[in-house]
Regions:
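Conserved RNA-binding domains used in RNP assembly and mRNA/RNA metabolism
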Residues: 1-87
């Protein structure tokens, strides 16, 4: 099941990278919003765009946790992928 999920997540990541859309990656305790700059074998890297930082927010409270210039997350930790509308 893990390999199949990772393959689906990776397919979505490549689609967002291809169109250059801002993406939201949901992980168990937080989510991150930004633009994909690199999809590696096990990690995906997001960067800020248009002068805004990568947004890292708590899933429980929605509170901002940090605003780094870029962040890398492990693909196997990603629960879901979405656009940034309404996130």
């Amino acid at each position: 099941m893990g390999i199949q999920k990772d393959t689906k997540i990776r397919t979505l990541l490549h689609a967002f990278e291809l169109v250059g859309a801002r993406v939201v990656l949901f992980l168990p305790s937080f989510h991150v919003e930004g633009f994909i700059t690199r999809i590696g074998e096990t990690f995906v890297t997001l960067r800020r765009g248009n002068g805004a930082g990568v947004e890292v927010e708590s899933n429980d409270s929605g509170q901002a946790l940090e605003n780094p210039h870029q962040i890398s997350v492990k693909i196997s930790d990603i629960i879901s992928v979405s656009d940034d509308r309404g996130a």
